[in-house]
UniProtKB/Swiss-Prot annotation:
SUPFAM superfamilies: DTD-like. It comes from the Bacteria. Belongs to the DTD family. It comes from Solibacter usitatus (strain Ellin6076). This is D-aminoacyl-tRNA deacylase. Keywords: Cytoplasm, Hydrolase, RNA-binding, tRNA-binding. It catalyses: glycyl-tRNA(Ala) + H2O = tRNA(Ala) + glycine + H(+); a D-aminoacyl-tRNA + H2O = a tRNA + a D-alpha-amino acid + H(+). The lineage of its organism: Bacteria, Pseudomonadati, Acidobacteriota, Terriglobia, Bryobacterales.
């Protein structure tokens, strides 16, 4: 799994002109799922998202996680994170999981994050979405679950 995490002051996602998810202070998490991903990958990344200390403390140092910052999380599926542009000009998405397989793991990831006290909003899986956000900092972090095996 691959996540792009952005610290935001506000964000919302629309599908066909209707807002389906919105947050104020918090994290926007774009989620890409590959063919080889498992529940272990989702567990690892859910823990990372919830524990990531990228919010400022009283001294301005990045020392608080999203719960400590009284923030929320907006999770959005994005298979294009597995776009491979090494050959030609059109990305190949061969590494991305098939929609049914990806939906199961995406829902598991969302449900795992929702077990925390942090409010969670989502986009709509496999929909064309309009995502608007105000990146605070800016702070943008990319985390891949395969990193857990590199320790």
């Amino acid at each position: 799994m691959k996540l792009v995490i952005q610290r935001v002051s506000q964000a919302h996602v629309n599908v066909e002109g209707t807002t389906v998810g919105a947050i104020r202070t918090g994290l926007v998490v774009l989620v890409g799922i590959s063919k080889s991903d498992t529940i272990k990958d989702a567990d690892y990344l859910a823990d990372k998202v919830l524990g990531l200390r990228i919010f400022p403390d009283n001294e301005g140092k990045m020392n608080r996680n999203v719960a400590e910052a009284h923030g929320a999380i907006l999770i959005i599926s994005q298979f294009t994170l597995y776009g491979d542009c090494r050959r030609g000009r059109r990305p190949s998405f061969d590494a991305a999981a098939a929609p049914g397989e990806a939906l199961t793991l995406y829902n598991y990831f969302v449900d795992t994050v929702r077990k925390s006290p942090v409010p969670v909003e989502t986009g709509t899986f496999q929909a064309t979405m309009e995502v608007s956000l105000v990146n605070q900092g800016p702070v943008t972090i990319v985390i891949e679950s395969e990193e857990r095996n590199r320790k």
